[in-house]
């Protein structure tokens, strides 16, 4: 019985303390049982398994405790086994009907799991049990005494959780975010059936949307993109009027002034940008070709800026000044830099200067304007004139001042600038520039950050810094530690031959940024550039990383330069030169002073400046060396040209002489070998010297042709004398002209002003005044556009006469009166008629009498016609009659040829006829002629041609032309037309053409008297008819 009592579990003391014990449910009441109706038998078996394991553990422990008890017989053991089976069956039924609420475990039962909670979701219940098993159940304080030794270590997991939370609380936010990303982030690629797509298939094609470039206001590209983004938010997809563009972006920089919009149609772009400021969609858009789309979207890696790096300023007062980066903003778009200020503290301020228009460009923005030198900020200087603008500010370290709205710390200007306003590539800071940024340490010495400087120089090393044969060393990369000599350079890749190590003799390629020159102590080197010690020679005494310290050959001082600025050299620095300077070199001391070197010392230079003063300066005080100009020209006191190498003499003063060594503006530096002072160098002015001898035998006199601007105005002296110059107002002023040559060819304008060579023309088309050479202008008629000849000048002969016309003759053309040059008028005593004559007019051809306009004499070239009155057409016979009539007196006005000299008629009284005859005023000369005389042109009865007796003059007495008097007959018809027959014809006379009394067969040319037969030709006797 006692054994059976021990086998039963009566519960712990906790059951007695439980105020609300669990109600016992009747096994017959199925509704009160909290079992799930859908659970199967397998689940029930799994739920009761832990209870079975617990009972077995308890039974084993009790059996161990009762090992010393008396033995029992086999029957009792069988009964015990039966009782155990019955208890297990009751436990199974109790486990199934046990409610959800769990009682607190205590004592030893804490270590045993006697029940399994059943929930609606089996999986969630199992997960909760696993978590409780890991973290451990809650312990009651009273149970601590019942725990065995070491049981308190069960809260190990609690302490571990506390430590984990403390560690997470002490973590940085970035590290915590990284840890969470690693823990909960996606650590594997998404499941996909797609294979790797080649990049060429990702390129845009004609099926993809197009990209349109739209013009916008430069500098407003980002604002336009933000406005498009805002409009897309206002008109999303699915709204009544959605935005149909796909994307929009801008590139800036070289592509400023354009934004790029991706869309299917151009109309969609215009609709999206309609009524938007700073963008011009109505202008011509640019359709980006498909092949250029990848280049448009390609992004280049921006330069990484680090604090302590070196940059230069692009524009403004500090243009090209070196600056050091103090801080970089998180977005990388702005930096804080430290630079040496340029301030004048108001010393050069003009109080009376007018107010500067804010729209105009500020003086500080123009690099050409003189700017103050670089100096550290001085509050003492600022207080002198701008004390009201100066105030002290609190800073973490050093002296901080606010002056004119800017901050100065330890004398440096601290300024916030955008990255696009900085030069970040190929900065190449010089050592003297970096020295100004040296920070003072506590012991008073300067502390120069060479590490950041070297890093900047490595990124800006030029490719031409390495020449074949330079010893180099690879200091970073996979090939670090290799030593060799360069053999060739291709861009930024240098090929070198390894000289040391296992790879000796092999050629390898290395980038320029991973190389540095290698020197050893004792090498003789030369500074090649990038430093103020350029061309300095010396011996290497110390090498430390990228810096080399050498001992100068001339100054015997140690200087430190970068290895990239050095090169091995076999030259020596003790040849009378100090670096790049030699005796007799012309150097620039400042903006207004030049000097000639007269002596070179070990550390200094002795110079003679343009004012005649002797100075001793250091090589660093020289601004630059002036290259001698061999073609420089000046003029001496007499105006003669002087050049380099000419010998000149001083006129006033000491009257020194010498050979011209340098010509600089109005100063001459002369060299005299006989003078020992100042190495024979003297300085004089050009206006105080005269030429003694010119180099090469050049003429020493002034070139007068070049001194006369009138001779040089047309390209040089000419052999012909030009036309006389006119005075007064130029004739071309006010004329309409056209340009016939040059850039304004074909344009028409009006001359507003004119000189000897140039004319100021106001062009009609451009409405502006231009200066054009006169020789390129042609005068035009403003109405008809015809060219007007302007070369005759004013005061030329008037046509038809220079004399004023009389009132009754004014209507004639060309006019009649005193001048006989008129053709064909008549009147008065001056016969202008051709071929007739009248009075003493000698203008007839071949007229007679007065001297002039006669046909030349065949027998004497000095005479025209014959004698003093040789106006007659030549003929034979002593009187040289024209055409026939004997040897009448030539002294009479009516000599033998008075009638015959006319062509072809005669009669002085009927001079109005052209030509005719009339009256009894025929010549009293003999009408007899020899038998073989040619009757040319007529005789006493010769028919006049074409005029008649009362033929009208041509053009007439007054206005009507050609008619004259009322009874005048038209010309050529006449009363007696035949010409030139004579008074008595011989049978063999040539009938040319007819006469008044000609035979019936004379040829009537062109007419004869009124009773003549004009109907047809006449025939001589015996002449066959045609």
Swiss-Prot record:
Bias kind Acidic residues: ranges: 61-94, 114-133
UniProt biased composition (Basic and acidic residues): 1-11, 30-39, 48-60, 153-172, 1015-1026
Domain of life: Eukaryota
KW Transcription (keyword) present: yes
GO biological process: mRNA processing; regulation of DNA-templated transcription elongation; regulation of transcription by RNA polymerase II; transcription elongation-coupled chromatin remodeling
CDD domains: KOW_Spt5_1, KOW_Spt5_2, KOW_Spt5_3, KOW_Spt5_4, KOW_Spt5_5, NGN_Euk
Gene Ontology terms: cellular component: DSIF complex
Ranges where the record places region Disordered: 1-172, 694-729, 788-859, 905-1026
Main location class: nucleus
Keywords in alphabetical order: mRNA processing, Nucleus, Repeat, Transcription
GO MF term set: chromatin-protein adaptor activity; mRNA binding; transcription elongation factor activity
Biased composition regions of type Polar residues, renumbered to the chain: 905-926
Keyword Repeat listed: yes
Biased composition (Basic residues): 98-107
PANTHER family noted in UniProt: SUPPRESSOR OF TY 5, TRANSCRIPTION ELONGATION FACTOR SPT5
Quaternary structure and interacting proteins, as annotated: Component of the spt4-spt5 complex. Interacts with RNA polymerase II.
Described function: The spt4-spt5 complex mediates both activation and inhibition of transcription elongation, and plays a role in pre-mRNA processing. This complex seems to be important for the stability of the RNA polymerase II elongation machinery on the chromatin template but not for the inherent ability of this machinery to translocate down the gene.
Family per similarity comment: Belongs to the SPT5 family.
Protein name (Swiss-Prot/TrEMBL): Transcription elongation factor spt5
Organism: Aspergillus oryzae (strain ATCC 42149 / RIB 40)
Taxonomy of the source species: Eukaryota, Fungi, Dikarya, Ascomycota, Pezizomycotina
């Amino acid at each position: 019985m006692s054994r059976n009592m021990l086998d039963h579990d009566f519960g712990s003391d906790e059951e007695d303390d439980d105020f609300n014990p669990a109600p016992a449910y009747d096994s017959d009441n199925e509704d009160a049982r909290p079992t799930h109706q859908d659970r199967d038998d397998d689940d029930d078996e799994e739920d009761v398994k832990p209870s079975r394991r617990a009972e077995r553990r308890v039974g084993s422990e009790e059996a161990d405790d009762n090992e010393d008890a008396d033995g029992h017989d086999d029957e009792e053991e069988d009964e015990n086994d039966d009782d155990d089976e019955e208890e297990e069956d009751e436990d199974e039924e109790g486990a199934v009907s046990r409610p959800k609420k769990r009682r607190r475990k205590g004592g030893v039962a804490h270590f045993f799991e006697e029940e399994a909670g059943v929930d609606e979701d089996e999986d969630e219940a199992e997960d909760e049990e696993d978590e409780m098993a890991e973290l451990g159940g809650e312990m009651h304080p009273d149970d601590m005494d019942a725990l065995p030794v070491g049981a308190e270590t069960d809260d190990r997991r609690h302490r571990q959780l506390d430590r984990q939370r403390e560690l997470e609380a002490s973590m940085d936010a970035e590290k915590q975010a990284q840890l969470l990303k690693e823990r909960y982030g996606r650590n594997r690629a998404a499941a996909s059936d797609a294979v790797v797509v080649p990049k060429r298939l990702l390129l845009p094609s004609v099926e993809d949307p197009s990209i349109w470039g739209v013009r916008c206001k430069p500098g407003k590209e980002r604002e336009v993109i933000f406005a498009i983004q805002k409009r897309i938010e206002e008109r999303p997809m699915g709204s009544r009027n959605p935005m149909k563009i796909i994307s929009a972006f801008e590139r800036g920089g070289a592509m400023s002034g354009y934004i790029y919009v991706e869309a299917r149609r151009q109309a969609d772009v215009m609709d999206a940008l309609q009524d938007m400021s700073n963008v011009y969609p109505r202008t011509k858009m640019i359709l980006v070709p498909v092949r250029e789309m990848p280049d448009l979207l390609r992004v280049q890696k921006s330069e990484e800026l680090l604090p302590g790096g070196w940059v230069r300023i692009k524009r403004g007062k500090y243009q090209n000044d070196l600056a050091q980066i103090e801080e970089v903003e998180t977005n990388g778009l702005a930096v804080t830099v430290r630079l040496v200020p340029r301030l004048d503290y108001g010393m050069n301020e003009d109080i009376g200067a007018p107010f500067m228009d804010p729209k105009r460009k500020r003086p500080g923005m123009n690099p050409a304007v003189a700017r103050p030198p670089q100096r550290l900020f001085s509050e003492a200087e600022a207080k002198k004139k701008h004390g009201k603008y100066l105030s002290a500010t609190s800073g973490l370290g050093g002296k901080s001042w606010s002056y004119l709205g800017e901050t100065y710390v330890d004398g440096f200007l601290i300024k916030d600038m955008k990255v696009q306003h900085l030069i970040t590539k190929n900065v190449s800071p010089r050592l003297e520039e970096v020295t100004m940024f040296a920070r003072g340490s506590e012991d008073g010495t300067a502390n120069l950050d060479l590490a950041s400087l070297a890093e900047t120089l490595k990124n800006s090393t030029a490719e031409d810094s390495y020449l074949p044969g330079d010893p180099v060393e690879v200091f970073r990369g996979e090939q670090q530690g290799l030593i060799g000599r360069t053999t060739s350079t291709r861009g930024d890749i240098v090929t070198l031959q390894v000289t040391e190590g296992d790879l000796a003799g092999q050629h390898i390629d290395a980038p320029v940024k991973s190389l540095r020159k290698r020197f050893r102590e004792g090498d003789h080197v030369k500074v090649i550039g990038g430093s103020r010690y350029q061309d300095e020679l010396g011996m290497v005494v110390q090498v430390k990383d990228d810096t080399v310290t050498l001992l100068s050959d001339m100054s015997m001082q140690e200087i430190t330069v970068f290895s990239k600025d050095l090169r091995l050299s076999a030259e020596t620095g003790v040849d009378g030169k100090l670096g790049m300077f030699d005796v007799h070199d012309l150097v620039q001391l400042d903006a207004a002073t030049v000097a000639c070197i007269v002596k070179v010392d070990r550390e200094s230079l002795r110079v003679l400046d343009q004012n005649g003063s002797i100075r001793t300066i250091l090589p660093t005080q020289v601004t630059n060396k002036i290259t001698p100009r061999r073609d420089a020209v000046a003029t001496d006191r007499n105006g003669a040209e002087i050049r380099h190498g000419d010998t000149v003499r001083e006129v006033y003063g000491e009257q020194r002489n010498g050979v011209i060594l340098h010509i600089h503006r109005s100063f001459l530096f002369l060299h005299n070998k006989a003078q020992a002072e100042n190495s024979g160098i003297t300085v004089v002015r050009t206006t105080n010297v005269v030429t003694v001898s010119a180099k090469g035998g050049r003429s020493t006199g002034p070139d007068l042709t070049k001194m006369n601007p009138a001779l040089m105005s047309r390209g040089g002296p000419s052999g012909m004398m030009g036309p006389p110059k006119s005075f007064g107002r130029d004739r071309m002023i006010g004329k309409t002209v056209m340009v016939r040559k040059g850039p304004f060819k074909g344009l028409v304008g009006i001359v507003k002003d004119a000189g000897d060579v140039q004319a100021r023309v106001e062009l009609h088309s451009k409405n502006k005044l231009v200066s054009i050479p006169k020789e390129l202008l042609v005068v035009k008629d403003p109405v008809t556009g015809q060219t007007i000849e302007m070369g005759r000048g004013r005061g030329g002969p008037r046509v038809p006469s220079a004399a004023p016309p009389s009132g009754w003759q004014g209507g004639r053309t060309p006019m009649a009166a005193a001048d006989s040059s008129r053709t064909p008028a008549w009147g008065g005593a001056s016969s202008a008629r051709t071929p007739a004559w009248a009075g003493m007019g000698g203008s007839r051809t071949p007229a007679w009498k007065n001297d002039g306009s006669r046909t030349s004499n065949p027998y004497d070239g000095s005479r025209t016609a014959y004698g003093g009155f040789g106006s007659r057409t030549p003929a034979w016979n002593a009187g040289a009659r024209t055409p026939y009539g004997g040897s009448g007196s030539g002294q009479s006005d009516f000599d033998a040829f008075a009638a015959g000299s006319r062509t072809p008629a005669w009669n002085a009284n009927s001079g109005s006829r052209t030509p005719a005859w009339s009256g009894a005023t025929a010549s009293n000369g003999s009408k007899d002629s020899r038998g073989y005389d040619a009757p040319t042109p007529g005789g006493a009865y010769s028919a006049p041609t074409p005029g008649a007796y009362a033929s009208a003059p041509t053009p007439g007495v007054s206005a009507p032309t050609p008619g004259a008097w009322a009874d005048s007959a038209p010309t050529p018809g006449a009363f007696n037309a035949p010409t030139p027959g004579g008074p008595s014809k011989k049978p063999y006379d040539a009938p040319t053409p007819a006469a008044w009394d000609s035979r019936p067969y004379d040829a009537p040319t062109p007419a004869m008297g009124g009773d003549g037969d004009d109907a047809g030709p006449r025939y001589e006797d015996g002449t066959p008819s045609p």
